[in-house]
């Protein structure tokens, strides 16, 4: 396991870096956006609920971080044109992208496969893998403008070992792991872009509550607790690390 939960980031770790976080309105995305801004990054907050993004925006400003930006987008309905329009807007505003955290995700249902709704399956695949893939393609020219770019795809333990009833979510995370291998290998030795997958582990989030409704959330780490690995992967201390499968926290005993 490759875990950096004890990492001690420099206060200015991400100074002068432009970082986009998807699903930035709450949970791990919110914690990552706040943490990246605290360490100097200009954060682009992407999500589907403007009110949530505005709250995170206000939190960053109140903490004295660099002025963030808000970009509303719903992966479920996003088209290739939406991604390319977004890239064009970011190019005009920032001229480059130094980091991309694919955090937005959809659980779907934990249910036997023979009862899985095909429309829900397609929604999960769109949000968890298809959308992030085509967004990454649209943003590659901006990432190539950075001297040291990091792309992080959110994985899961069920994307590394399949579990009964996890259906589309598990399959989408296996696809994520495969795409990280492909893209990292493709960009090796010809790009300043590193690409890795990161499994947050058991964390106190709404998705976790939906998946494990009987679990005591206070036995879990908070999103803030697992930020060291997110910071390490996004910052220059992980330079040269690409195509790796990392964990944000040690496995639960």
Question: Where in the sequence are the language-model features?
Answer:
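C-terminal helical subdomain
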Residues: 3, 189, 193-198, 205, ...
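Substrate-binding pocket helix/loop in short-chain dehydrogenase/reductase
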Residues: 86, 111-113, 117-123
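Catalytic loop of short-chain dehydrogenase/reductase
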Residues: 133, 144, 148-189, 202
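Conserved glycine-rich Rossmann-like NAD(P)H-binding loop of the short-chain dehydrogenase/reductase
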Residues: 41-55
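Rossmann-fold cofactor-recognition segment
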Residues: 63-79
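Conserved glycine-rich cofactor-binding loop
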Residues: 18, 23-27
């Amino acid at each position: 396991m490759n875990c950096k939960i004890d990492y001690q980031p420099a206060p200015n770790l991400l100074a002068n870096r432009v970082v986009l976080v998807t699903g930035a309105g709450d949970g791990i995305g919110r914690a990552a956006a706040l943490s990246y801004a605290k360490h100097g990054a200009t954060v682009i907050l992407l999500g589907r609920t403007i009110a949530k993004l505005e709250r995170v925006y206000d939190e960053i400003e109140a903490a004295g971080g660099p002025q963030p930006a808000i970009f509303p987008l719903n992966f479920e309905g996003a088209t290739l044109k939406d991604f390319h329009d977004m890239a064009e807007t970011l190019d005009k505003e920032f001229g480059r992208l130094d980091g991309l955290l694919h955090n937005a995700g959809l659980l779907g249902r934990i249910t036997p496969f023979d009862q899985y709704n095909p429309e829900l399956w397609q929604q999960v695949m769109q949000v968890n893998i298809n959308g992030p893939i085509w967004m990454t393609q649209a943003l590659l020219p901006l990432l190539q403008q950075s001297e040291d770019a990091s792309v992080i795809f959110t994985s899961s333990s069920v994307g590394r070992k399949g579990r009964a009833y996890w259906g589309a979510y598990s399959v989408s995370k296996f696809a994520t792991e495969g795409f990280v291998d492909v893209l990292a290998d493709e960009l090796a030795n010809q790009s300043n872009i590193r690409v890795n997958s990161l499994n947050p582990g058991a964390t106190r989030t709404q998705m976790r509550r939906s998946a494990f409704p009987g679990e005591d959330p206070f036995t879990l780490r908070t999103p803030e607790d697992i930020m060291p690995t997110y910071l390490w992967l996004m910052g220059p201390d992980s330079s040269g690390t690409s195509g790796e499968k990392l964990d944000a926290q040690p496995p639960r005993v």
